[in-house]
Amino acid sequence: MDLKWQDAEEIAIRLAEGHPGTDPLTVRFTDMHAWIVALSEFRDDPTKSNEKILETIQMAWHEEYLDSKS
């Protein structure tokens, strides 16, 4: 599956799998951006992200993180 910036849920799942135990609220957006564009399935323009998109992905990842803790 090719991932684009709008695929927040899928990106969040990939980040949770790739960085287990990492609290996404402690990750800087610059690091998260780098991790996202490094995903093998990511096929979007790296310059097309913005703070709102990254916040959406961060919150989706945070939900995955909380689910893994319960």
Regions found by a protein language model. Name each.
Residues 1-70:
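A charge-rich, low-complexity, intrinsically flexible signal that marks solvent-exposed coils, linkers
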